Amino acid sequence: MKTLSEFIVERQAEYPNAKGELSGILSSIRLLAKIIHRDINKAGLTNILGQSGIENVQGESQMKLDLFAHNTMKAALMAREEVAGFASEEEESFIAFDTERGRNAKYIILTDPLDGSSNIDVNVSVGTIFSIYRRVSPIGSPVTLEDFMQPGNKQVAAGYIVYGSSTMLVYTTGNGVNGFTYDPSIGTFCLSHENMQMPKEGKIYSINEGQYLKFPQGVKKYIKYCQEEDKATHRPYVSRYIGSLVADFHRNLLKGGIYIYPSATNYPNGKLRLLYEGNPIAFLAEQAGGVATDGYRRILDIEPTALHERVPLFVGSEDMVKKAQEMMEEFKE
C-alpha cells in the first residue's frame, strides 16, 4: 500500500523543476494531523475539553481544543523554511514569519485549525482545513496582507483532515483529489481513496433546518424541493446534517449530496469564512467534479475584501448545486 510520503515524492517527480517546498509543507501538515489525532483521541481523559474562556476575533467562544490546534499548527509551520506567513480563523491578523528564512519563503497558509470543535465534547467528528498560496509580495521582505487576500482560484493546494471513526487527510494540488487514512499501528497515512470523484447527482442535503424561518426564499424553496416526492428525480432526498463542515462535506464527497450554509436574517453575509473554509472546500469540490457557489457566484472567483470575510456556501454534487442556484436566482432582488 502506498504511503502519503511515497505519494508526495511521486507527484513531485512529475515536475522536474520542483524544489520540494510544497512537499515539505504537506509533510508538516501530515505531522500536525498525527498530533491532533493523538490529542483528540484522549480528549476526554485530559483537560482539553470545553471552553477556554476566551473569544476569537469573530466574538465566538474558543474551545480549548481550538487553541491547542491553532498553536500546534502555528508552531509546526514556523519550523518550516518554506512558509512565509500564516493566517488562522482564531487570530485577528495574519502572522508574518519575520526571520531570514521566513522572508525568503514562497508560500503562505490559511487555516481553520479545528472546524466543528463545539462537537468534540459529544464525540462528533471534527476537522482541520488548510489552504496554500504562493505569496505575491517580494521575496526577501515580510509578507503583507495582500498575500492573504487572494481569490481561491490562486490556491496551489488545499485540503482537510477529518478526525472521526478513522482519521483521514484529503488534499488537492490542482490535479485531482486523493485521500489517505491514518494507520495508528504503524503511524502512517496510507492512500485509501485515489482520485476521489463526487457523484454528479446526489440524494443527501445538509443544512441546519432549525434556522428555516431565517433563510432566503430561494433556500426555503430548495428545501421543499428536496422533501417532495418524485420518482423521476429520486426524491425525497435524505437530510443529513452533522454541524461540522468537514464531516458533512466529506460524506457528500463520497456519497453525493449538497451542503448549504446560506445567508440568514441573523447572518446576512453567511457565517462561514471565505478564506479559511469557503475557498479550500470549493477547490476540493471542483477538483472532484463538484460545484461551489455563494448562491450566485463561483466561490473561487470571489475577490476577498477582509481577512475574516464571511460567505454563504452551496457546495456539492453539480446537479444539486445548480438546482439550488436556479432557485436562488429566481428570488434574487
Swiss-Prot record:
One term of GO molecular function: fructose 1,6-bisphosphate 1-phosphatase activity
Compartments where found: Cytoplasm
Principal subcellular localization: cytoplasm
The protein's Enzyme Commission number: 3.1.3.11
Cofactor notes: Binds 2 magnesium ions per subunit.
Co-factor requirement: Mg(2+)
Pathway: Carbohydrate biosynthesis; gluconeogenesis
Catalytic activity: beta-D-fructose 1,6-bisphosphate + H2O = beta-D-fructose 6-phosphate + phosphate
Residues where Mg(2+) 1 binds: 89, 112, 114
InterPro entries on file: FBPase_C_dom, FBPase_class-1, FBPase_N, FBPtase, Fructose_bisphosphatase_AS
Transmembrane segments: none
Annotated substrate binding sites: 115-118, 208, 241, 271
Residues the record lists as binding Mg(2+) 2: 112, 115, 277
Keywords: Carbohydrate metabolism, Cytoplasm, Hydrolase, Magnesium, Metal-binding
Claim: Oxidoreductase is one of the keywords in the record: no
Biological process, per Gene Ontology: fructose 1,6-bisphosphate metabolic process; fructose 6-phosphate metabolic process; fructose metabolic process; gluconeogenesis
Gene Ontology CC annotations of this record: cytoplasm; cytosol
Assembly and interaction partners: Homotetramer.
Family statement: Belongs to the FBPase class 1 family.
Protein name: Fructose-1,6-bisphosphatase class 1
Source species: Haemophilus influenzae (strain ATCC 51907 / DSM 11121 / KW20 / Rd)
Gene transcribed to yield this protein: fbp
